[in-house]
Design a protein with these regions (language model features):
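Conserved alpha-helical segments that form or flank metal/cofactor-binding pockets of metalloenzymes
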Residues: 57-90
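Membrane-helix exit/interface motif
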Residues: 43-47, 74-77, 81, 99-101
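Conserved small/polar residues in nucleotide/adenosyl-binding loops
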Residues: 126-128
Length: 128
């Protein structure tokens, strides 16, 4: 893992994850599609929830980019002969959100930090 991800995440993704991912390509792709969709909906939700914070300028392009990624992953799923379907969300994001503040303004800050951690973790996996 590049040093910049280690500084942000404070831990490396286990090497065993790669082997498990290779053995579970269908579920990995479906989960990836769901993560892209969730990133887009979270961006839109934040724009809606905090209209006074001027988030639309930054988050609207992000939502479009994440939806583009969602569509790209859907094409890969179809190409591989898999079928997109609903799956149970993983515990990683849920655990982070459960530990976050429910009171403003900390709720917004925690949400943005959690989104950044999830994105950083996914980017760190590229460098296994």
């Amino acid at each position: 893992m590049p040093n910049k991800w280690k500084k942000i995440l404070h831990s490396q993704t286990p090497k065993e994850w790669l082997q498990k991912a290779l053995e579970s390509q269908e579920i990995l792709l479906i989960d990836h599609a769901h993560c892209e969709k969730k990133a887009a909906t979270t961006a839109i939700s934040l724009i809606h929830r905090y209209p006074d914070k001027n988030l639309a300028k930054k988050l609207s392009p992000l939502a479009r980019e994440e939806l583009l990624h969602f569509e790209q992953v859907l094409r890969v799923i179809k190409k591989e002969g898999y079928k997109y379907r609903n799956i149970r969300p993983g515990a990683y994001a849920k655990t982070l959100y459960e530990a976050s503040s429910k009171q403003e303004p900390q709720r917004l800050k925690d949400t943005l930090i959690i989104c950044a951690l999830i994105e950083a973790r996914s980017l760190s996996l590229i460098h296994i």
